[in-house]
Amino acid sequence: MKFDVCVPILGFENVKEVTLEKIDDAFMRMESSNDEHISFTLINPFALREYDFEIPDATQKLLEIDEKSNILILNIAIIQTPVEDTVVNFIGPMIFNTDNNKAAQLVLSESTKYGVAEKISLYLKK
């Protein structure tokens, strides 16, 4: 599924359109539509932990989100070997409106509540 990026991805401001592809129930791959060398592994944060935040009104307007919108929230993960060393960016979620194919990266102000590089091993069941 293709998405127009309405709010730039930090460090990748030239990425204007991405494709999203499901890997499994927890992971997805996001790739730039115009540069195959730019891709990210995304994870469903709700598969790992409790995760909540408010989407600012300005972002809701850009993505045309209302109470009936179908949205998908994913976080960028840096996959490591072993997988327990994988880190997740919880303060920069990607927001996807699947009704109109618009996306944005949000930088949360609650940075003390979530980390930029939290080890996935903190949330895996042992």
Swiss-Prot record:
BP terms from Gene Ontology: bacterial-type flagellum assembly; regulation of translation
* Gene3D superfamilies membership: BH3618-like
Origin superkingdom: Bacteria
Q: What is its main location?
A: cytoplasm
InterPro entries, per database record: Flagellar_assembly_factor_FliW, Flagellar_assmbl_FliW_dom_sf
Q: Where, subcellularly, is it found?
A: Cytoplasm
> Mind listing the UniProt keywords for this protein, alphabetically?
Bacterial flagellum biogenesis, Chaperone, Cytoplasm, Translation regulation
How is this protein named in the record? Flagellar assembly factor FliW
Native species: Sulfurimonas denitrificans (strain ATCC 33889 / DSM 1251)
Taxonomic lineage of the native organism: Bacteria, Pseudomonadati, Campylobacterota, Epsilonproteobacteria, Campylobacterales
